[in-house]
Structures are given as structure tokens and as C-alpha cells.
């Protein structure tokens, strides 16, 4: 007889570990049962990736409201971005949705997939801009529909992961906003599961600006295809490294920022060895993507940081 399994148990069993599930017909766990962190077998493994967001000011497509066009000599499109990843020793490329051509087709995605394969690059994921805390109605439906559309795009690209946002508690209590977010995550997570795509909710301010709130949502969502997209630069608490450590066991993707800013303190360079130790201690296995957001020229700085990350891995 089949019994309910937690989403972590489900994923664990899919990875070949000895999970407690007898089948996958009862994926939804009881809300009273806290979900455990991912229990990965084997040793920590890191696959170097680069987020297209790192070159946000230079994409020909995207940011269509930008006041000034990028320098023609330094413009880049998604194909050239994949080439950059290949030329700088990356395993993967995170193709942020903002920088795709307007009204692109499935044929465009297939050409990009083919190009990446021939350059020896995996599409490690994509990232969307969404708000899951809108009240029920047309605008909320548009948000979930957009995420589902990108789930379809990710499947076609062969991308295993999409970064999603939670949202803010605008005009409502934080608890009400969390409930709305959880409902949207479960709806989209169910759909993502039919396509074999993970959704990683990012610690991106709003109702998930602190680790405990993010983990409350993660533990409540009843989908084995939902995890944390851990952005190492997005906690601005008194001890952001502690917050990273709390969330690392739930991570399905990690985005490394070269700067961090604790509460009440100026920005400072991230302690890469310390972050690597946290990830290794949590037995993280997966993509480790540079998302360069600092003020210096990414064309100069990104290669330097990719080299440092590779050495730390």
C-alpha cells in the first residue's frame, strides 16, 4: 500500500538513496509534518555556472526600458553569452529570461539549445521575475501563467531549474502574503513536476528577506519540485553567513555574489572560502553560478571571479 512521502523523501529516492517512500502516488505530505532538508548521498559536488544577469547592461535584448543602449562594441546576445561561458571554462550557463528577444519562438530555444550543446555547455537554468503574493484575481493568474510558460521553455531548453521570487506583503500581513505565495508555489510546482523542472525560490527581499521566513514557506509547500535558490548576497541581517548555512541544505541552485552587506554595515567582499565550507558542510551538490552584481566592469571582473570560484571548488 502506498503511503504519503515528503518532497525531500521523493527527491532523495529519485537520486537512488534509501528513501521511505513506497511510491509516488501520494506526493502531498501532511501539513503537520515538517519537511527535512535534502539528504544527498555521496560527497559535495559543484558545477561552475554563470548567470546572464552578470552582463545585464550589455545584452542587445532585454531591459527594453533602458535609457541608453549598450556600447555596440560590447553588446552581447544569448548565443554570445553561451560562447563566453564556454571560453571561460564554465560547465553551465544560466540564461536569465530578461535577456531573450521579444516574442521569441520555440525554434529560437532549440537553436540556443543546439548551440550550447555544441559548445559543451549545459543550460543550468533560467530565472524569471514574478510576484506570488498578489491577491487572487487576473493579475495573480497572469503571474502563475507566466511562470508556467517559462517552465515549458525550460523543458524545451533542457534546463533543470528556474529561479522564482516570492513577493512582498504590500497591503496585507506577512502571514497572508506567505499563504498566497505557498498556494502559487504549489500550483506552479505541480506543473513543474510534470515537466521535470525544479523551481527555486530565491531569498530576494520581501517576505523572504530572512532565512526563517523562507524556510517556513519551503517546509510548508507540498511539492517535491520546490527548493531554495540560494543567493549568497541577498541576506542583509546581522549574520548573513548564518542565514546561508540555514538555507544551504534546502538549496537546488546557488548563486554566488562577490559582495555581501550585513545589517548596518557597508558592502564588503564575500568570504568565498567560508561560503564554500558552508556548502560543503551541507553536502550541496549542483550548480554554483556566479551572478556578478558589483560596480566594476564585468568583462574584466567575471573571468577573475570564475577562476577564484573554480579554485575554491
Protein language model features and the residues they cover:
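Acidic/histidine-rich catalytic cores of soluble enzymes
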Residues: 92-93, 182-278
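Short loop/turn motifs enriched for small/polar and acidic residues
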Residues: 53, 167, 231
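A structural motif
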Residues: 90, 154, 159, 251, ...
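Short acidic/histidine-rich active-site segments
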Residues: 289-292
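Active-site groove signature of glycoside hydrolases
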Residues: 154-174, 195-204
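Glycine-/small-residue-rich active-site loops that bind phosphorylated ligands and cofactors
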Residues: 100-101, 169, 206, 235, ...
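N-terminal pre-domain/capping segments
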Residues: 2-156, 176, 183, 223, ...
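A short helix->loop->beta-strand "cap" motif at the edges of active sites that frequently abuts
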Residues: 121, 197, 282-286
